[in-house]
Structures are given as structure tokens and as C-alpha cells.
Amino acid sequence: MGRVVAELVSSLLGLWLLLCSCGCPEGAELRAPPDKIAIIGAGIGGTSAAYYLRQKFGKDVKIDLFEREEVGGRLATMMVQGQEYEAGGSVIHPLNLRMKRFVKDLGLSTVQASGGLLGIYNGETLVFEESNWFIINVIKLVWRYGFQSLRMHMWVEDVLDKFMRIYRYQSHDYAFSSVEKLLHALGGDDFLGMLNRTLLETLQKAGFSEKFLNEMIAPVMRVNYGQSTDINAFVGAVSLSCSDSGLWAVEGGNKLVCSGLLQASKSNLISGSVMYIEEKTKTKHTGNPTKMYEVVYQIGTETRSDFYDIVLVATPLNRKMSNITFLNFDPPIEEFHQYYQHIVTTLVKGELNTSIFSSRPIDKFGLNTVLTTDNSDLFINSIGIVSSVREKEDPEPSTDGTYVWKIFSQETLTKAQILKLFLSYDYAVKKPWLAYPHYKPPEKCPSIILHDRLYYLNGIECAASAMEMSAIAAHNAALLAYHRWNRHTDMIDQDGLYEKLKTEL
């Protein structure tokens, strides 16, 4: 009798373990980790992905990270007379928890973003100028726009509050198979609607005036994304959040996060250009034929290749930016036509010709940054004094009136245009680049899953392009790759996560 009971208990225990392994990620039986993972692109997305993949798959996985240019990607710097200045992504929001965690884990130092007073120029006059006094700024804003600035702040806060849910989801290891499903999990149909409507349409419907949109909102879009209020409403909200106080940067340059993550992930950097990726059947050391991805790349004039279990593409699939070909996939990998915005960053060390913007004497000008409206005939999007990446404080007052100014423009500035902007200048350096997507809603985001074990990070940029967005996309892709490798389907695309996790508190 005792033997029968023991066998029955043993059978029930076995059944329970089987059921648990099918439905419980904590108790699930894990597959052996992959042997090799390739990541293409060593910007913030690629290096973040390497960091998270190492955390999930463990120390024995070999991770190769391909980069044809410098580690850091679009987090580039420019040199002016021996000093480095941020060329692109320069400020980080205090609620960007991924970037904050990276800086803490890597032991990096931070600096507060350059301050100073800001003005808005409409092509004829400064329609708004900041004051050193907070109460004066409030009076100016209320006098000109009523309480629209307060309403705008509340609108952005509401979007950010919902967006912050992603950190809780990812802390519980939940992943999403598409950008749309990720956004829907955060803000439901409202967030998807924002992706498919212009910022202008959204804010007009909310009752904001044309004057406020042209003078307060459009200039922010022009400086952050080189575009107008015709961008989608979601990226518009992300852009407006960058107007908050408490913005910061990494001392020494934001690109140090990328090199730090690369080192922390113990990945192998391959300084080469990936030419194509092809799925092939290969016999592994176990003796079983396995589907793998052959990555063919070029170092100098030499062409090489290697095989990988998982591949993450962390560079825009744009012919002008990566030019990767996908060979012999069935079905074929979809081609994306995500155009990227051409922008030119120019750094000039010189004395600003303030008479362009104001009739006040040069010593009474007082503004550190000037943004422009859409209907401005001026050939720049913005101009502002910048600190080098090593400076912990704002630049000291100049004894000769010269500062380093950063200018964003749609086209390369001519010498005549620089001479119009400056009374005199000592040095000028420019960087034309494809900095972020050209937003034209409705937006259809590229797939995250390109093939069985082939993933694409940069589709998140169709919603919004920012350092934090890339880090979040990298974490999501790493979780997605891990769960799909281990067949944890219950950790992907789960409905009702907000309510579910709220009840677990």
C-alpha cells in the first residue's frame, strides 16, 4: 500500500513540475544558452543590448559587436581648439531611468546641462525672452498665452506618467514583439493615436492657440528634431519633455556610456562594416544541423564571415546609414523606407552679431540660446552657447565677447551666412548627418522580429528618437530574444500588465 501511495505522489509531483515548467518562467527549464550572438551597431542601442544580453544569457555566451565607425554612434563629439563638444544627443531627462542606471553602474560623473536665458525669434523680433526672475517669466507667459504653458506642462506630464510604466514592466522581465504593442501596453489606444496624428492636430484639438503653437512649441521641435509640429504627437511629447528643468549630461561626453557598456558586457568589438546576413544550416558541435545566421563583414579590403545563433541589428536599416543586405530569407525580410532627417551641426567660436535678433547693445543682449519659429526666414533652427564635455559649470563670462556657439541648420552654412551671424570668429567646424527619422504620421513602425532569431532595435525611433528610447528598445529586444530562445511565451505581449502588476504591490 505504501509503495502505491509513494508512486502516486511521485506521479503527481512529476505532473506538477511539468505543468510548472510550461507555465511558470521562474521554474521553467531553460535551454542551453546560445553559443554566439552578433550585434550590429555600437551606439547606445547596440551597447545597451550587449549589456542586457550578458545579464540574461550569462557569462559563457560570446557576443560580437560590429561597428564600422566609432563606438557611440550618433552620440558623437566635435573638436574646437582642443576641446570636445556634444554634436548630437546632448541632454538627458531626470526621469530617464535607464541612462541614470547606466551612469551609476559604470561609475561615471554627470554635469548639469548648460543654463542661461532663452529667446524665441520669429524672423523680425524676439517674441519671447526669458528673465532671470521666475515670477517675471510666469507673468510674461500668462500675459501673452494665458495659462496654455501650464496646460502644456500637464499634458506632457500625463504622457510621461504613462510612459514610466515601461520600467515596471521590464523590471518584471516582460517583453513586447512590436513597437505598437509596447506603446499600447503603456498608454492604450491614446498612445497609438498619438503615433498616427500630428502634434499640430493633437494640440489644436486640445484647444491650444495658433500663436502658442507657433511661438512656444514649433521652436522646440526645430531644435530637437529639425522639423515642425507636423511630426507625430508622441515624439512631440518626448521633445517637449526636454524643456523641463534638471536636464543633465555625462561628464566627458555621453558616448562614454556606450564605451562603458561595451566593456561591462565583455563583448568583442569588431571594427568592420557588415555587408550582408544570410540564414544557413550548419552542423554544430552537438552534431545536429541547426539554422544559424552567417554575418559577412569587411575590415579594410578583407572580407570575413562568422555564424551566430542570434543577431540584433542596432543601426538604422537605411541605405545611406547601414546598407545591410539580407540574403535568401523565406519569406524575404521586409524593406523599410524610413527616411532620416538631414541636419547640420556647426560649432563656431566667435562674437555673436546680436543685432540680428535685437536692437539692444551687445553687452545688454543677455541670451544664451535663441530658437526660431517656423515662419522665420533665418537660415538656422537654433543657436546657443555650449560648454565642453569636460566643463562642470556654464562657461565663464568672456573677456573678449567670444563663446563657442552650437548652430543647428537644415543646410551647411556658407561663409557669408557665418559672417552674418558673427561680428568675428576664430574657428568653425561642421558635421552634416542623418540624426533622426523624418516624421510623417501616420507612422508604421518596422518589425522588431525580422526573422526567427533576428531582431531590429531601431524601429523604436519611428515613435521617438532619443537615448532613453534606444536603451529601452535594447532592453526589450534582449528580453524578447531571451524569452523566445527559452520559449517563455507567457512573458511576451501580455495584456493588462498595468492592472496585474498594480495588484501585486
From Swiss-Prot:
Q: Where does the UniProt annotation locate this protein? A: Lysosome
- Main location class: other
SUPFAM superfamilies hit by this protein = FAD/NAD(P)-binding domain (SSF51905)
**UniProt superkingdom:** Eukaryota
Q: List GO molecular-function terms, semicolon-separated.
A: farnesylcysteine lyase activity; prenylcysteine oxidase activity
Which GO BP terms, alphabetically?
prenylated protein catabolic process; prenylcysteine catabolic process
Q: Which reaction does it catalyse?
A: an S-polyprenyl-L-cysteine + O2 + H2O = a polyprenal + L-cysteine + H2O2; S-(2E,6E)-farnesyl-L-cysteine + O2 + H2O = (2E,6E)-farnesal + L-cysteine + H2O2; [(2E,6E,10E)-geranylgeranyl]-L-cysteine + O2 + H2O = (2E,6E,10E)-geranylgeranial + L-cysteine + H2O2
User: Is Lipid biosynthesis included in the keywords of this UniProt record?
Assistant: no
Q: Which cofactor does it need?
A: FAD
Record-given protein name: Prenylcysteine oxidase 1
